[in-house]
Amino acid sequence: MTQPPASAPPSGGRPAFLPNDLDPTVFDEGFLRQLERLLLLLKSPVRGGLKGGRRSVKRGQSVEFADYRDYAMGDDLRQLDWNVYARLERLFVKLFIEEEDVTITLLLDASASMASGTPQKLLFAKRAAAALGYIALASEDRVSLSVLAGRAARRRTGLRGSGRVFRLLADLSSIEPAVGPTDLVAAARHAAAQLTGRGVVVLLSDLLDPAADRVIRELAATGSEVVILHILSPDELDPALEGDLRLVDAETGDGVDVTADLGTLDAYKTRLAAWKASFADLAARRRASYVDLSSDMNLAELMFAELRRRRVIG
């Protein structure tokens, strides 16, 4: 008998625990059931400290036998199948299906610039983090949530098991944008220092920091698999501006006077495309995944189309 998701009310519809800032037209029972069929994909095997929900074939002891392979120098002699040796006079090591756990670390940029945009970038990031966190918890992966603000990463949540999704969403709902400047590089470095072992790190950020390329380098240097969800708002991607304007930095309060005309906007879009391409190139060189997004993207499209196409989930 199919059980309802841990988060779903018996009557179906919108789960009652979901915070108000999680769109009730998206986070319904059907959406959650679809998320439960997904996994965050790994490019290479990751060895966790506990048994979890991911199945991998490896040497060792487990409940389910998988296959044999030829013995190699250094293999554990206890895993040799002596019955096969007696028949074939060849040494084989037994392989088993073992379920591993993986830590999924969600790094949420809560700098002041993330509060801008329509729809707000931070709100989109929180919703995306909620969906990714739900996938991980339903897969019995461990989930860690850290907020990047100021010069530090504030670790909010370390969870495991689908029943802990309530705590994850409550923590996400309580996150507010920072007041004042955020040093994204320092915050990312602080977050990297808190990582234990290898896993998957997902950064949700607008990357509006003069040294944002160093953020990717810092995270990639941890040895974890890194996913960059680069979130910009529609008015940043295609600004509808004209005339004489004063643009004010959301974090520092510094302003600059500009005249917006067709030439200015064309130059802006050219530089924007080159800026995003530089992140994509850097991510590829560091074996990270880079996904550029607009904050007006439908969440179902993000989870079931875009991130699957980019092989982030599957």
What are these regions (language model features)?
Residues 114, 172-176, 287-290:
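Short amphipathic alpha-helical interaction patches enriched in hydrophobic/aromatic residues
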Residues 1-57, 193-199, 209-211, 215-314:
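Von Willebrand factor type A / integrin I
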Residues 127, 131, 182-189, 277, ...:
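Short, contiguous clusters of charged residues that form electrostatic/catalytic patches at enzyme active sites
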